[in-house]
Swiss-Prot record:
One Pfam family hit: DUF525
InterPro entries assigned to the protein according to its UniProt record, in alphabetical order: ApaG_domain, ApaG_sf, Uncharacterised_ApaG
The organism's place on the tree of life at top rank: Bacteria
PANTHER family cross-referenced by the UniProt entry: F-BOX ONLY PROTEIN 3, POLYMERASE DELTA-INTERACTING PROTEIN 2
Residues of the ApaG domain: 3-127
Name the record gives this protein: Protein ApaG
A single BP term in Gene Ontology: error-free translesion synthesis
Species this protein is from: Azorhizobium caulinodans (strain ATCC 43989 / DSM 5975 / JCM 20966 / LMG 6465 / NBRC 14845 / NCIMB 13405 / ORS 571)
Length: 130
């Protein structure tokens, strides 16, 4: 579990390797990740957009931008939470994801919230150290 808090918005990321959707011999690996967003502040906020940076073990970087998450732009009142699960494929058995959400406060202010960097690793993979 990976967690970051920005301006009283807490984001927790929990990745999980999905073996049944992966074909390691073909260079296809798939992870599901669950994100929980909690409003610890005193003002309602809306998640308006996302920006992901996905890096594989070869250093190949893919950036993903889009409105909301999983087709929604959730509103979180004070104390409110929103959770969703999505997925990401990689051609390598390890990688890392990070990013941010653009939020709109009920006051009209916009701000970015960090999504903590989280590791994408095939479980039980032998590690080679140089």
């Amino acid at each position: 579990m990976y967690r970051a808090t920005t301006r009283k918005i807490q984001v927790t990321a929990t990745p999980r390797y999905v073996a049944e959707r992966s074909e390691p011999d073909q260079g296809r690996h798939f992870w599901a990740y669950t994100i929980e967003v909690v409003n610890l502040g005193k003002v309602s906020v809306q998640l308006k957009s996302r920006h992901w940076v996905i890096t594989d073990a070869h250093g190949h970087v893919e950036e993903v931008h889009g409105a909301g998450v999983v087709g929604e732009e959730p509103v979180l009142p004070p104390g409110g939470r929103f959770e969703y699960t999505s997925g990401v494929p990689l051609s390598t058995p390890t990688g890392i994801m990070s990013g941010h959400y653009d939020m709109l406060a009920e006051t009209g202010e916009t701000f970015s919230v960090e999504v903590p960097a989280f590791s994408l690793d095939v479980p039980h993979m032998a590690r080679i150290l140089n």
